[in-house]
Curated annotation (Swiss-Prot):
Compartment(s) where it occurs, according to its Swiss-Prot or TrEMBL record: Cell outer membrane
Name of the protein this chain belongs to: Outer membrane protein F
Annotated TM spans: 22-27, 29-44, 56-68, 71-83, 98-107, 111-116, 152-158, 167-178, 191-201, 204-216, 231-242, 244-255, 281-293, 296-309, 323-334, 337-346, 365-374
Function as written in the Swiss-Prot or TrEMBL entry: Forms pores that allow passive diffusion of small molecules across the outer membrane.
GO biological process, any: monoatomic ion transmembrane transport
Gene: ompF
GO molecular function: porin activity
A GO CC term assigned to this protein in UniProt: pore complex
Membrane topology per record: Multi-pass membrane protein
Family designation: Belongs to the Gram-negative porin family.
Extracellular side: 45-55, 84-97, 117-151, 179-190, 217-230, 256-280, 310-322, 347-364
Keywords: Cell outer membrane, Ion transport, Membrane, Porin, Signal, Transmembrane, Transmembrane beta strand, Transport
Species this chain originates from: Serratia marcescens
Signal peptide range in chain numbering: 1-21
Amino acid sequence: MMKRNILAVVIPALLAAGAANAAEIYNKDGNKLDLYGKVDGLHYFSKDKGNDGDQTYVRFGFKGETQITDQLTGYGQWEYNVQSNHAESQGTEGTKTRLGFAGLKFADYGSFDYGRNYGVLYDVEGWTDMLPEFGGDTYTYSDNFMTGRTNGVATYRNNNFFGLVDGLNFALQYQGKNQNDGRDVKKQNGDGWGISSTYDIGEGVSFGAAYASSNRTDDQKLRSNERGDKADAWTVGAKYDANNVYLAAMYAETRNMTPFGGGNFTNTCAATENCGGFASKTQNFEVTAQYQFDFGLRPEVSYLQSKGKNLNVPGVGSDQDLVKYVSVGTTYYFNKNMSTYVDYKINLLDDNDFTKATGIATDDIVGVGLVYQF
């Protein structure tokens, strides 16, 4: 019974923090440095050869802070991912820096940081991105404007509205242009800004909304189906997190922002090619329901869909589903550091002319993992 009670307290905190129990490396004279990470022994089972096989990875990072004055604190974070499913001869293939930023926190006046960080749209998207393995992929991609992890973002955050309203948080974000390092057109962005706000009204209930708008680069306008000057997105969401129950839902729309399909981003790709582009508009919906048993089991069922509008792929129609699946999974926590999970992605996309033309996968995937985290 004691173990069950401990797990009931530890696991929700683990899920909220993203790390089970960061190892404190140094804590002296107002300076603190923590190490966190995980090793995920992960395997996919699928008829799709591109998604079948070993997916093991290692992820670790540092969080540090320094007390400058009683009102001013400096902080920084760095996170790195190492793929462990490649031959040694392939070297560092798949390794990447996920996060890297530094900032200052000014007591109740908020915090400001700059670097590689999450875009403010993820403040709401993160509520539904809680599946054991899959999820968070209707419109959120790394280095896709301010939808996920991205470069060159200056972020101001304020919690509890200057200390005046408990649970009312907001963020303002600016992103500089990213196109000068030879990156793929799908990963480029012009100057942009975003705003988000979340409100925890108590009893486990929270609401949130976010908006972002960016200039598109010349390459994005010339080498894709959509040639609009701006890329925009907005999202709203809600969650309930109490009494061992977790429920969350999100709706979002994007314009000239969400990439789909393969690498041939041209406005003349034929239906027989692995073509793709930016969707003129997408409508995105995600919902997840989970329950945490005291003995460590956490079952989950979720539904995710992204519908693209005015896709301009010749011969296949202008409106198509880009993402559509049901996730059924469960995680079992042995303790705060060790867990195992299985996640079954039931792909509801049809194998049709559109998915063949764009190379979008339509097969189911089962992910099975064993995780050590600290």
